[in-house]
C-alpha cells in the first residue's frame, strides 16, 4: 500500500508550495521576540492564511513573504543553519511526556571542550546571507540577542486537551518540514508514527526543492515540480 495508491497525486506539490510560503514568512519575520516584534497572531490569522494558500508562483520562483500587518521594514535573510541536532520524544506508562531537542549547532559545535561538554556555535544561526543595506534582517546579530532556531519540539493535543502525539526532529533548517511531514503522515495519510517518521522527505525553501531517495514515485514527483 503506497502513498500514490491513496489518491494523493498532488499532495507533494501542495506540500512543497506550503513549505515555500511558510519559509518565506519565517525567514522574514522570525527572530528573538525580545528584540523584534514578531507578528505571530497576524501570521496565524485565518484570512491571512487563506490569502497565502491561494498564492500562485512559478516552480523556479522565490516566493515573497506575506505582509499581514500591512507594512514591513525588514531585510531578506537566506541563511542556512548547520545540522548538528538531536531530538527525542517520550511518553511513559503514566502519561508523562517530553519532546526534547538539543543542539550544539554544527557537528561538535565550536569544537571547544569545557567541563565535559562541547560549547555550541549557535551564532551561525544569526542572519549571515543578506545584502549589506538597510533595513537589516530581523535575525541580524546583536549583543545579548538570541539567534533564531529551527528547533521544533512538538506536542499535539485533541480538542478535549488530551495528548495525541509527541514529535520533533533534528535537521537544521529542514526541521519544520520534517515535523510537518510527520504530522501530515499520521493524521492525513493514516500512517503509524514510525512510518510517518521514516517516510522520505521533500523539503522546499526558496526556489530549491530536495526530494529524498525513496519518495514513492520520486522521478514523477520531481518532474511534476518543474
Feature-to-residue mapping (PLM):
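Internal maturation/activation junctions in enzymes
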Residues: 9-103, 112-114, 130
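Active-site rim segments in enzyme catalytic domains, especially the processed small/beta chain
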Residues: 96-165, 176, 189, 193
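Positively charged, low-complexity/disordered segments
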Residues: 1-8
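Hydrophobic alpha-helical scaffolding
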Residues: 9-10, 38, 42-43, 77, ...
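Extracytoplasmic/secreted envelope proteins and their assembly/folding machinery
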Residues: 16-19, 176, 180-183, 194-197, ...
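Structural signal for hydrophobic packing residues in well-ordered secondary-structure cores
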Residues: 6, 19-30, 52, 56, ...
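Extended C-terminal subregions enriched in glycine
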Residues: 94, 144-146, 188-226
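Hydrophobic, well-ordered secondary-structure elements that form the walls
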Residues: 22, 95, 155, 179, ...
